[in-house]
């Protein structure tokens, strides 16, 4: 999945600043920037390989749609070891809200 959907959602409903990055989207909020990787359709399981790819691209977060993608235990643990957080989109939005991003709807 490209970052298109996430860009559209964040621009239309939040005060976070996003670039047009693909495959890595920079999301800036409250003086902080997270670099987000959204898995491609063939990466419907977030494994250690996907975590390594995201890290190599410079990601700090892997955010995914829980309707078609899942994170394996191995993938989450390896990502954590690499310093990359793995979360569904809903979790990413909750994280942003906890960090001070304002959402309009």
Regions found by a protein language model. Give the residues of each.
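Acidic-basic catalytic patches of nuclease active cores, encompassing PD-(D/E)XK
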Residues: 1-23
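Generic detector of well-ordered alpha-helical segments enriched in charged/polar residues
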Residues: 4-8, 51, 76, 93
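Solvent-exposed, well-ordered amphipathic alpha-helical segments
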Residues: 5-9, 30-34, 78, 88
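Alpha-helix initiation/capping motif
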Residues: 19-22, 47, 72
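Conserved catalytic cores of phosphodiester-cleaving nucleases, focusing on short active-site segments
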Residues: 24-55, 59-65
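Short, compact, well-ordered microdomains
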Residues: 61-98
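Short, surface-exposed amphipathic charged segments that create phosphate/polyanion-binding patches used
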Residues: 99-105
């Amino acid at each position: 999945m490209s970052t298109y959907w996430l860009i559209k959602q964040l621009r239309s409903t939040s005060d976070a600043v996003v670039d047009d990055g693909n495959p890595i989207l920079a999301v800036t909020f409250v003086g902080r920037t997270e670099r987000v990787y959204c898995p491609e359709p063939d990466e419907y399981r977030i494994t250690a390989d996907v975590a390594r790819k995201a890290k190599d691209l410079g990601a700090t977060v892997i955010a995914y749609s829980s309707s078609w993608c899942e994170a394996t235990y191995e993938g989450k643990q390896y990502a954590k070891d690499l310093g990359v957080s793995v979360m569904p989109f809903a979790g990413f939005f909750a994280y942003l809200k906890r960090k001070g991003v304002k959402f309009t709807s």
